[in-house]
């Protein structure tokens, strides 16, 4: 009887953990789908910072004045 209770408790515990992990993953996916414009803004910021960093090198190559 004791081993049966132990087994059932273990199954309940593992099931609870797996359900909570699935719920967290689902919430993360929903969050990613809810805010695509924020992600686009982050990509634009990264692109602009890279473009501004490359600008002096570009002028150096074009005008040959470093």
UniProtKB/Swiss-Prot annotation:
Q: Name one GO biological process term.
A: defense response to Gram-negative bacterium
Leader peptide range in chain numbering: 1-22
One Pfam family name from the record? FSAP_sig_propep
Propeptide ranges are 23-44
Q: Name one GO cellular component term.
A: extracellular region
Show the disulfide pairing: 60-66
Q: State the UniProt keywords alphabetically.
A: Amphibian defense peptide, Antibiotic, Antimicrobial, Cleavage on pair of basic residues, Cytolysis, Disulfide bond, Hemolysis, Secreted, Signal
InterPro entries from the entry? Answer: Antimicrobial_frog_1, Frog_antimicrobial_propeptide
Intracellular or extracellular location(s): Secreted
Q: In which tissues is it expressed?
A: Expressed by the skin glands.
Q: Does the keyword Signal apply?
A: yes
Record's function text: Antimicrobial peptide. Has low activity against the Gram-positive bacterium S.aureus and the Gram-negative bacterium E.coli (MIC<15 uM). Has a strong hemolytic activity.
Family per record:
Belongs to the frog skin active peptide (FSAP) family. Brevinin subfamily.
Q: What is this protein called?
A: Brevinin-1DYb
């Amino acid at each position: 009887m004791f081993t049966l209770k132990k087994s059932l408790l273990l199954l309940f515990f593992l099931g609870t953990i797996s359900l909570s992990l699935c719920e967290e993953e689902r919430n993360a996916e929903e969050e990613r789908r809810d805010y695509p414009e924020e992600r686009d803004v982050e990509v634009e910021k990264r692109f602009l910072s890279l473009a501004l960093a490359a600008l002096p090198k570009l002028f150096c190559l074009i005008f040959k004045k470093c």
